[in-house]
Swiss-Prot record:
Function: Key enzyme in the regulation of glycerol uptake and metabolism. Catalyzes the phosphorylation of glycerol to yield sn-glycerol 3-phosphate.
Binding site for glycerol: 83-84, 135, 244-245
GO cellular component, one term: cytosol
Catalytic activity annotation: glycerol + ATP = sn-glycerol 3-phosphate + ADP + H(+)
Gene name as annotated: glpK
Pathways involved: Polyol metabolism; glycerol degradation via glycerol kinase pathway; sn-glycerol 3-phosphate from glycerol: step 1/1
Protein name: Glycerol kinase
Binding-site list for sn-glycerol 3-phosphate: 13, 83-84, 135, 244
Binding-site residues, ATP: 13-15, 266, 309, 313, 410
Residues where ADP binds: 13, 17, 266, 309, 410, 414
Similarity field: Belongs to the FGGY kinase family.
Entry-linked SUPFAM superfamilies: Actin-like ATPase domain (SSF53067)
Enzyme superclass (EC): transferase
UniProt keyword Transcription regulation present: no
Native organism: Shewanella sp. (strain MR-7)
Length: 494
């Protein structure tokens, strides 16, 4: 039977999805299932690993059934996943010893402080590209080994396995035959040396984590094993893995130095490819692993905006200025500018490049002439300003010239925001026809690994651009707007 499709498993923080792509990179079928969020204590976030697996395996079957696709028509399955989330299970039984500790969970803060006290903060930064923070997997592993009865003893006997969500799904799909991750996920564990591309023995010793627990690290564009869907049909290659943000970077074909993407969600995630240079940031950005055009390891700078779409939710839910997020474009376009109004949405402090947890949100420039439209416009513009803050930091750190900005996520449907992003960054913003770029990246990696597609050059013909947003303001206006934004940010920090 002819191989016509590639399936991407997109395992996210709140739902599991399966998306089927045809040879032209068109979406043929989508299936999605939400799963339970567990909050056993303040600041703790968990998932049930078995529910993750049940939801992901069911949507895989459902996505093919909906489109009437036989499993023998599937060339490969790729995996993309929420990063950092930590699962430990028994090697013999496949039974998790504890719930998955989610990337958002802060329970291992004390362990991070202990590592800082041991003088490891700079070592971590230099060798992993990360900050010493509970966000990442390493301290979550230690917490499980320290707090689950018999876990550490079992781990030292080689009876337990660790994996991020990609590894867990691969283990389940291959019925326990394959214990593997890829460099993009390994690089988010706090245990992976991004220069040697191997597990870091110094950090394993510091956290007392047995190396035997850890998965083998294989390239992101590889065939790892095979699976049969619902136990039927032929064996399908499991062929591409990347963490969600790196998958989106590859889905946008940002495979050369200076190429960048911004995912506009609740927050914004920006990644810039820096090629074969692991750039250490002087602006608090993370250095991480990306995927190059041949599936090889590239590096990237990564930064996040805390309040993106969440700022628009605040306008709707707390201020009642809009009924729906899509209303913002209409109201923002009713005025020529913000009339001097700036919103700095530092509701939970400011992230990179400021890193000021004590900053708080504020509206500046209010006069009797300021109205709802000005405030809504200022809220949208704040997303673009914060993204520019990060992009400028990436350019300074890397020395790369930003070629263009690829965009994805829910907010890219807002033409006003995309145009202002182009205006304020003085770079062309490119919105793709297929905005499911995270899943598309996993599909591209899987398809390339099995020869379904031959090269990134071929993929460039598949990845169509829906709209180009070109800068449309002069340099003096751009500078004046941004200087005023920086002044507003400084005021939130005083």
């Amino acid at each position: 039977m002819q191989k016509k499709y590639v399936v991407a498993l997109d395992q996210g923080t709140t739902s599991s999805r399966a998306i089927v792509f045809d040879h032209d990179a068109n979406i043929v079928s989508v299936s999605q299932r939400e799963f339970t969020q567990l909050y056993p204590n303040p600041g703790w976030v968990e998932h049930d690993p078995m529910e993750i697996w049940a939801s992901q395996s069911s949507v895989l079957i459902e996505s093919l059934a909906r489109a009437g696709i036989h499993s023998d028509e599937v060339a490969a399955i790729g995996i993309t996943n929420q990063r950092e989330t930590t699962i430990i299970w028994e090697k013999a039984t496949g039974k998790p010893v504890y719930n998955a500790i989610v990337w958002q969970c802060r329970r291992s803060s004390e362990i991070c402080e202990q590592l800082k006290a041991q003088g490891l903060e700079d070592y971590v930064r230099e060798n992993t590209g990360l900050l010493l923070d509970p966000y990442f997997s390493g301290t979550k592993i230690k917490w499980i080994l320290d707090n689950v009865p018999d876990a550490r003893a079992k781990a030292k006997r080689g009876e337990l396995l660790f994996g991020t969500v990609d590894t867990w799904l691969l283990w389940k799909l291959t019925e326990g035959k394959v214990h593997v991750t890829d460099p993009t996920n390994a690089a988010r564990t706090l245990l992976f040396n991004i220069h040697s591309l191997s597990w870091d023995t110094t950090l394993l010793e510091a956290l007392d984590i047995p190396a035997a627990m850890l998965p083998e690290v294989r390239p992101s564009c590889s065939v790892y094993g095979t699976t049969r869907i619902a136990g039927e049909g032929s064996e399908i290659p499991l062929a591409g893995i990347a963490g969600d943000q790196q998958a989106a970077l590859f889905g946008q074909l940002c495979v050369e130095p200076g190429m960048a993407k911004n995912t506009y969600g609740t927050g914004c995630f920006l990644l810039m490819n820096t090629g074969n240079k692991a750039v250490r940031s002087s602006h608090g950005l993370l250095t991480t692993v990306a995927v190059g055009a041949q599936g090889e390891v590239n590096y990237a700078l990564e930064g996040s905006v805390f309040m993106g779409g969440a700022t628009i939710q605040w306008l709707r839910d707390e201020l009642g200025l809009i009924r729906d997020a899509s209303d913002t474009e209409y109201f923002a376009s009713k005025v020529a500018d913000t009339n001097g109004v700036y919103l700095v949405p530092a509701f939970v402090g400011l992230g990179a490049p400021y890193w000021d947890p004590n900053a708080r949100g504020a509206l500046f420039g209010l006069t009797r002439g300021a109205n709802r439209n000005h405030i809504i416009r200022a809220a949208l513009e704040s997303i673009a300003y914060q993204s520019k803050d990060l992009l400028d930091a990436m350019i300074k750190d890397s020395g790369e010239r930003l070629k263009s900005l690829k965009v994805d996520g829910g907010a890219v449907a807002n033409d006003f925001l995309m145009q202002f992003q182009a205006d304020i960054t003085d770079v062309e913003v490119l919105r793709p026809s297929v905005c499911e770029t995270t899943a598309l990246g996993a599909a591209f990696l899987a398809g390339l690994a099995v020869g379904f597609w031959t090269s990134v050059t071929e993929l460039e013909y598949k990845a169509c651009i829906d709209k180009h947003f070109k800068p449309n303001i002069d340099a003096s206006q751009r500078e004046r707007l941004y200087v005023d934004w920086q002044d507003a940010v400084a005021r939130t920090r005083s």
